[in-house]
Amino acid sequence: MKILMVTGYKPMELNIFKEDDSRIQFIKASIEKRVREFLEEGLEWVIISGQMGVELWAADVVMELKEEYPVQLGVFPPFENQDGRWPDALKEKYEELTMTADFFKPIYKGDYQGPYQFRTKDMWLIDKSDACLLLMDEEFPGSTKYFYDTLQKTAKDYPVFTITPQDIDDVVEDLRMQDPHYWD
């Protein structure tokens, strides 16, 4: 696998409303754990659409991993000005990402036109990647359901690796056990 797509929940679906929410560090650690494994096996690119939440957090992880691995980050939003209605803090983060990513190109020119742009974006990212890392709870799929349904219908031999709530709990426990005060 050379190209991995990463996607998952938007922050609101996880009841995360601030960038300093402590749960983000656990999600990032879970993403890092999986991406690091793929990098050890030869992963070269991580691609995302740049939506807020899991995808922006994955971008942060990839940018940090660039210090250790020759990984590249591609950002392919469904349309220009994807961040038009986002909170200012997330807009700034997204703008910075568009400048620091190794490759950035919206799939459609112009602003939002209709839901077909999201479906096209999903299919394009699936077509351009070798596998997907998806943060999703099958009991509460939220907006990831649309992407997951697309995968089920169209990408039969496409590997999907998931990060589940249990995976995040395991990472939380690992991080707690690394804290020297945990053992006091």
From Swiss-Prot:
Pfam families, per database record: YpsA
Gene3D superfamilies in the cross-refs: 3.40.50.450
Family: Belongs to the UPF0398 family.
Record-given protein name: UPF0398 protein OB1025
Natural source organism: Oceanobacillus iheyensis (strain DSM 14371 / CIP 107618 / JCM 11309 / KCTC 3954 / HTE831)
